[in-house]
Amino acid sequence: MNRDPYPPPGDRQTSGQAGRWSGGWAGRQKPQYNPEDGRYYNHGTGQQPPPGGGGRFSRDPREYGWNAGPGGGPGYPPPGMQPPAPEKQLRQTIKRTVKLVLPALLILFLVEYLFAFAVSFGISAYITQASWSFTDYPPDTYFGIPYGLYDLLTSYLPVVVGEAAALLFLRARTGLRLKDFFAKPEVLSREPGVEGGCREPERAPLSGGKLALWVVFASLAGIGVSMIGQIFAMVELNFLYEIGFPYYSPDFSTGGYTLLDTILCNLYICVLGPVLEELIFRGFMLRALQRHGSAFAVIFTSVMFMLFHMNLVQLFTPLLTGMFLALLAVKTRSLIPSICCHILNNTLSTVLSYIPFESDFAAGMATLAQIAVFILIFACFWMLWGRQFLPLMRDRDPAMKLSGKLGAAFTAWPSVTFILIYIGMIIYSTLMTWLSYYYY
């Protein structure tokens, strides 16, 4: 397509000459502004308008449609309505994309808490109608309901229902299919292959056992990234404790649970939860936002993944892990590696939580050894494959800097609403923790 990004200097249409261009455009078909990418195109050669046109001219200054009249000539804004600058148009486009996918997180929390409230209300009604006395309740129960079953109904099941609602919303809004995310991972080997006439020799894609080993290696490296986040979390916990403001990390222990309840809870933590979260964040959201640049999509979805955990301590771990998982998804064009990494990370944490230690010192030394081993694995992975990931974080878009894209995304109303919800939840949980520590 013959493209003229902008008309020549002095050929801008004036407010008094709507539909006319002076100078060098005489005798040629006039260039048309395309709101899809904020550029002008010359269709004097008979080329069709770019996608997104069609329809009649809109008086909305944010939209400039194509003229449906004879000859297929371009439509022009009325006097005084000049097309917005490309950067402004791109900012609006980014906000529209965020408004397309981010309400899924708001729906997730709304459905989750409404479902949890309904279940809690039903349990309260059941307890009220029960005729037992306090001494009749068996141990390890909540008014006769086993602790494991109570947690499943009020904590885990609402999250599953909320995440399922978010996935249905994203599926309807984006039009993407679940099978689109489970393609065979595309990974290039480190060894150069035959010369391909390019600047660098072609690298053969991995397949079979080599590809499976690479996915395992990347998953172990992802655990190393999580361990780096845990170091920051431990520093944060110690700092809060030193200033007299203790804050507890989430407790996923299953003490007092029946065997069936333990299996069901761990099934969500280790398998179902990672799969649903990867589909939401590294699947639908990342794929929709990636049209504005991989670096932008990776950073924005990782920050949302951090806020999604609604915990003051879980800041660096989900942020760093989310960035690594997003890079895996972008690099391999598949969710299989990121899902495997997420499952392995949660499974390892769950298994280690069941290992008894004779003292706190032994537990601390085991934790330090675990952190050192997996950080070493990550360092090895990055030395071998890091060069293939670094280009993904370089944003070379001439229309807008990465900071401008992130600013547009975080100022969209779904982002602001979600951040305010996060702040409110942190304030509430912090006050409850502080009151329970000092007054109970």
Can you name each region flagged by the protein language model?
Residues 1-215, 349-440:
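N-terminal, membrane-interfacial amphipathic/helix-forming hydrophobic leader that caps
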Residues 87, 205, 252-253, 258, ...:
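N-proximal short alpha-helices
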Residues 99-114, 118, 122, 153, ...:
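Hydrophobic, lipid-facing residues on alpha-helical transmembrane segments of integral membrane proteins
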Residues 140-142, 246, 277, 320:
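N-terminal start-of-chain detector that recognizes signal peptides
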Residues 176, 187-189, 241-245, 289-295, ...:
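Juxtamembrane helix-boundary/capping and inter-helix hinge elements in multi-pass membrane proteins
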Residues 223, 227, 261-440:
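Transmembrane helix-loop-helix hairpins at the membrane interface
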Residues 232-273, 297:
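His/Asp/Glu-rich metal-coordinating catalytic cores
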